[in-house]
Amino acid sequence: MNTSSVRPPTRDPAWLGRVFWSLAALVLLWPLLVATEFKPWVLLAPESLQVSGHFIGSFWPLAHGGEFLAMVARETWRTVAMATAGMTLALIVALPLTLMSTRVLSISALAGPMARGPFWLRQSVRWLLVVLRSIPELVWALVFVRVVGLGPTAGVLAIALTYGGMLGKVYGEILESGETDATQNLLRNGAGRLQAFFYGLLPASAAELTSYTVYRWECAIRSSVVLGFVGAGGLGQQMDNSMKMFNGGEVATMLLVFMALVALADRVSAWLRKGLG
């Protein structure tokens, strides 16, 4: 058989399937766009362009007074502190819940189905993690602002609860998806849950756990700025105050500082993940 005479197909053999799934996606997406009243062409209306131009024009000149920049530096540091303290509390919440919800660390499950008591305890902890991560940190911040008043304390507590639920869920999935033979051998030979965790699960999953934790810290910095708009302190609260006073120069300066802060957090996060990898 002369293979040199075989011509490649002139038409993609899978084109019909791609067209079908593209049309199906459009059919499913259209009702969602209608339900959300998505009308991007409104942005090009003369009134919208005029408002946008006036808003962007108010950003110049940038605010650069010494007293103002000192305040921005102070609130930026407070924002980083809020995110870091919130993540620390989130770890304190997540670690024990992870140990209780991870099936691999269940001694009663070694011989077969898990006993009734440990099973329901594990399920209760998993439901608690669902509740914690289902409520956005913005909602928690609104609640804590009413309880403890304005300031970073509300933001720290909000990040701690929401991120504690997220960390607990993902930590459990990472631990259960890794190599578990060493952990089960330790449990069968009389080791406790903590010993099995530190000497069995943790060494195999430490890099992935740390990488995800660093990523969540980066996300917490972004969230801490947003939480400031509901009174949780930090750079976001000062930005909200400047917007209410129609001081575009101050808003623009704080936006630039915020972008620089996020970029710095992203680089630190990437550096740490690279060092772990």
Task: Mark where each language-model region is.
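Generic hydrophobic transmembrane alpha-helix motif, especially the helices
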Residues: P118-A158
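N-terminal, non-cleaved signal-anchor transmembrane helix
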Residues: M1-T88, I92-P96, M100-W120
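Alpha-helical membrane-interface segments at transmembrane helix boundaries
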Residues: A73-A81, R122-L132, V214, E218, ...
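Glycine-rich helix-loop "coupling/hinge" segments at transmembrane-helix boundaries
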Residues: R146, R222-F258, G277
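Membrane-cytosol interface at the C-terminal ends of specific transmembrane alpha-helices
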Residues: V143-R146, L150-L201, A207-R216, R267
